[in-house]
């Protein structure tokens, strides 16, 4: 019995790791598509695409997955993909924006609407929550083995054209105007910095603490959206309560 239980636990951890890896690959695939679509599908002529490809390699993403995502952006394969955004409120009044990449808007809209409905949330009209977010360029640099003080990093970021910087224990987060993100990225790379992230994203102006009795529903909403193959990014204002780590 104990042997079966041990195998079950190991298998459960493996399944969880596989699911996590799948979500990482999904996000990288969307980033590859967007980078290739916004610029040249040849990484030799597209610095943003090279950065995402490096991230894909670091995550051990298979080459065929990388090539497939870039091929979609190049129009190879026939399907036409569109970027669409959905807005709504999740459990506890949390504002949620969903960015999707789809070849069938009806299918995607139905799936996103169902995810909100299943969790007790509601899908809203365009503009219903987007005003609660700021569109910003975000560049992240890991602090591991980086011999830089916060003040020195801030000065380098500002000299490169950044607007602001936030430091955590793990990384420096550098914020830019969306239109200047690529210029700041290039300037930092020229200074010798290795970038972990360089993208345009949506930053919440304020955070909403999810009530403890809504935490499970909120997590279900985010999980269901994340598992949707069409969903590229999820932006939300929610903060889960600390005590919502009780069940595995």
From Swiss-Prot:
<dbReference type="Pfam" id="PF20772">
    <property type="entry name" value="TACO1_YebC_N"/>
</dbReference>
<dbReference type="GO" id="GO:0003677">
    <property type="term" value="F:DNA binding"/>
</dbReference>
<dbReference type="GO" id="GO:0006355">
    <property type="term" value="P:regulation of DNA-templated transcription"/>
</dbReference>
<dbReference type="InterPro" id="IPR049083">
    <property type="entry name" value="TACO1_YebC_N"/>
</dbReference>
<dbReference type="GO" id="GO:0005829">
    <property type="term" value="C:cytosol"/>
</dbReference>
<dbReference type="InterPro" id="IPR029072">
    <property type="entry name" value="YebC-like"/>
</dbReference>
<dbReference type="InterPro" id="IPR026564">
    <property type="entry name" value="Transcrip_reg_TACO1-like_dom3"/>
</dbReference>
<feature type="region of interest" description="Disordered">
    <location>
        <begin position="1"/>
        <end position="22"/>
    </location>
</feature>
<keyword id="KW-0805">Transcription regulation</keyword>
<keyword id="KW-0963">Cytoplasm</keyword>
<dbReference type="InterPro" id="IPR017856">
    <property type="entry name" value="Integrase-like_N"/>
</dbReference>
<comment type="similarity">
    <text>Belongs to the TACO1 family.</text>
</comment>
<dbReference type="InterPro" id="IPR002876">
    <property type="entry name" value="Transcrip_reg_TACO1-like"/>
</dbReference>
<keyword id="KW-0804">Transcription</keyword>
<protein>
    <recommendedName>
        <fullName>Probable transcriptional regulatory protein Lreu_0552</fullName>
    </recommendedName>
</protein>
<dbReference type="InterPro" id="IPR048300">
    <property type="entry name" value="TACO1_YebC-like_2nd/3rd_dom"/>
</dbReference>
<keyword id="KW-0238">DNA-binding</keyword>
<dbReference type="Pfam" id="PF01709">
    <property type="entry name" value="Transcrip_reg"/>
</dbReference>
């Amino acid at each position: 019995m104990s042997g079966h239980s041990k195998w079950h636990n190991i298998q459960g951890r493996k399944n969880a790791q596989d699911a996590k890896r799948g979500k990482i690959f999904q996000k990288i695939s969307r980033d590859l598509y967007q980078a290739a679509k916004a610029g040249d599908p040849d990484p030799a002529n597209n610095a943003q695409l090279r950065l995402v490809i490096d991230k894909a390699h670091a995550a051990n993403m298979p080459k065929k997955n990388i090539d497939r995502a870039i091929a979609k952006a190049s129009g190879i394969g026939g399907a036409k993909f569109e970027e669409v955004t959905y807005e709504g409120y999740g459990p506890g009044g949390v504002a949620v924006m969903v960015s999707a990449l789809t070849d069938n808007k009806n299918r995607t809209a139905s799936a996103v609407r169902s995810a909100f409905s299943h969790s007790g949330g509601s899908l809203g009209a365009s503009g219903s929550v987007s005003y609660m977010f700021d569109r910003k360029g975000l560049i992240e640099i890991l602090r591991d083995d980086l011999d830089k003080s916060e003040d020195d990093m801030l000065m380098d970021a500002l000299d490169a054209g950044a607007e602001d910087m936030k430091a955590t224990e793990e990384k420096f987060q550098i914020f830019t105007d969306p239109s200047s993100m690529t210029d700041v990225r290039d300037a930092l790379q020229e200074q010798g910095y290795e970038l972990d992230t360089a993208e345009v994203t949506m930053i919440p102006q304020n955070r909403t603490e999810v009530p403890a009795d809504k935490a499970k529903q909120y997590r279900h909403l985010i999980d269901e959206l994340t598992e949707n193959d069409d969903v590229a990014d999820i932006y939300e204002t929610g903060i889960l309560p600390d005590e919502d780590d009780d069940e595995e």
